Amino acid sequence: MKIHEYQAKDILAGFGIAIPRGRVAMNASQVERAARELGGHCVIKAQVYAGGRGKGGGIRVAQDPGQAGEIAKELLGTKLVTPQTGPEGLEVRRLLVEEVVDIERELYLSITLDRESSRYCLIASAEGGMDIEEIARTAPDRIRILTIDPFIGLRSYQARRTALGLGLVGPLCEECVELILNLYRCLLERDCSLVEINPLVVTNAGWLVAMDTKMTFDDNALQRHCEYPDLVDYSQLNPLEIAAARFDLSYIKLSGAIGCMVNGAGLAMATLDVLKEAGGEPANFLDVGGGASREKVAEAFRIILQDRDVRGVFVNIFGGIMRCDIIAQGIIDAASGGGCRLPIVVRMDGNRVEEGKQLLRESGLNIRIGENMGDGAQQIVAMLNREVNQPCQS
C-alpha cells in the first residue's frame, strides 16, 4: 500500500525525524496562503504515487505567493508523467508546499525488504537526489547495503558504521545514528515494506532533514492498522485494481492486449512468461486464488472485460481445491451476460476438468480449449493476430 509524501513525512516526524515545514493544498488559493505562511519563497511538490517527480516537472520553486499560485494552476488537474508512471501519467490533485532549505549535501537512506534474503536491508549512499537510480545502475559500489539480522535487529554500531560511511563525523554522525535507528523503529512499528529518504540533506546550519520520503506498507499487515485505509488516495489507483480489491482478487494492470485469469500467483507468473514467449502481451496479472466461488470467478472475468485494451482472454486453471466446472460456470456467467465477442481460450486441468470443458463447449460462446499451457497461449495469440474483434460491452 502506497501513501503520499506528506503523509509519510507526518509519520516520520512522529518518530523524531526532522522534516521541512510544509502545508498540503488542494487548490491555488490554499497554495498561495501556505506560501505566505512560509515566507513567500517556497517549494511546490506534486503529490502522486510515483517517484521521479523532479524530472517530470512536478517539483517547482516559487519566489513569492503569487508565483506559487500560478504554479499550482499549472499543476493541479494535469497528468504528471515520470519515469515511474508510464506514458499515461497520474493526475495531480494535491500539492505539498514546503519551506526552502539551504542544502550543503544530499544523501540517500532507505530500509526495504530484500525478497532474495527475506530480510530487511539498510541502503545508504553519499550521493542522494534525483540521480540515485543512475548511480545504482552505473556505480553500484557507491551504494552501501547492510542486511539486517531479524533476530537481533539493527544495532547502534551498524548505524554508526553507516553514518561514517556517508562521511559524517562528530555530532552530525551521532545525529545520523539516531535517525537511522528511528527509521528502523518506524519500519517495524508501522509494518512498512519500504521507508526511503531521498534526499536526506545536511543543511548549511548543520542539521539532518528528510527533504523527500517514500513509504509503503505491507498489505498483509493492514488488518493491524485500522487507520491505514483512510490514508489511501483512490484517485491514484487504477479503477480495475480497486474493483478487484473489493472481491479479494490480486489484480495488476499491464500494458498488453491479452487478459489473463489464473489461480495461484506462481501459475499466473508462468502464464505471463508463456504468453510473452508465444508473441503475446498480457494485459493484466489476475489471481483468483485457490478456492474461489462461481460468483468470484464471474466478477474476476468481468473485471478483465472492463479493460478496453483487452482484445482476447486466456484462462489458465489448475483445479486442485478449485473445481474446473465452477470456473467454467463463472466464465459463462460473465461472458454471456456481457454480450462479449472477444476470443477466449481456456486451458484447465485437474478437479472435474471434463465437466468444465463440457460446459464451455456447450456454452455457444467464442471459447476454445487449450490442450496445455503452451498450446493455449499460442491459440490466443494466433486468434488475435488474424481477427479484428468488436469491443466487449460489459
UniProtKB/Swiss-Prot annotation:
EC number(s) given by UniProt: 6.2.1.5
One term of GO molecular function: succinate-CoA ligase (ADP-forming) activity
Reaction equation(s) it catalyzes: succinate + ATP + CoA = succinyl-CoA + ADP + phosphate; GTP + succinate + CoA = succinyl-CoA + GDP + phosphate
Required cofactor names: Mg(2+)
PROSITE patterns on file: ATP_GRASP, SUCCINYL_COA_LIG_3
Domain ATP-grasp residues, every copy: 9-243
GO cellular component: cytosol; succinate-CoA ligase complex
Positions of Mg(2+) binding: N198, D212
PANTHER family per UniProt: SUCCINATE--COA LIGASE [GDP-FORMING] SUBUNIT BETA, MITOCHONDRIAL, SUCCINYL-COA SYNTHETASE BETA CHAIN
Group of enzyme by EC: ligase
Cofactor remark: Binds 1 Mg(2+) ion per subunit.
Claim: Glycoprotein is one of the keywords in the record: no
The keyword Chloroplast is annotated on this UniProt entry: no
Organism: Pelobacter propionicus (strain DSM 2379 / NBRC 103807 / OttBd1)
Residues annotated as binding ATP: K45, G52, R53, G54, E98, V101, E106
Binding site for substrate: N263, G320, I321, M322
Assembly with partners or alone: Heterotetramer of two alpha and two beta subunits.
Any single GO BP term: succinyl-CoA metabolic process
Pathway assigned in UniProt: Carbohydrate metabolism; tricarboxylic acid cycle; succinate from succinyl-CoA (ligase route): step 1/1
The protein, known as: Succinate--CoA ligase [ADP-forming] subunit beta
Sequence similarity: Belongs to the succinate/malate CoA ligase beta subunit family.
Record gene name: sucC
Function in brief: Succinyl-CoA synthetase functions in the citric acid cycle (TCA), coupling the hydrolysis of succinyl-CoA to the synthesis of either ATP or GTP and thus represents the only step of substrate-level phosphorylation in the TCA. The beta subunit provides nucleotide specificity of the enzyme and binds the substrate succinate, while the binding sites for coenzyme A and phosphate are found in the alpha subunit.
UniProtKB keywords: ATP-binding, Ligase, Magnesium, Metal-binding, Nucleotide-binding, Tricarboxylic acid cycle
InterPro entries the UniProt entry points to: ATP-grasp (IPR011761), ATP-grasp_succ-CoA_synth-type (IPR013650), ATP_grasp_subdomain_1 (IPR013815), Succ-CoA_synthase_bsu_CS (IPR017866), SUCC_ACL_C (IPR005811), Succ_CoA_ligase-like_bsu (IPR005809), Succinyl-CoA_synth-like (IPR016102)
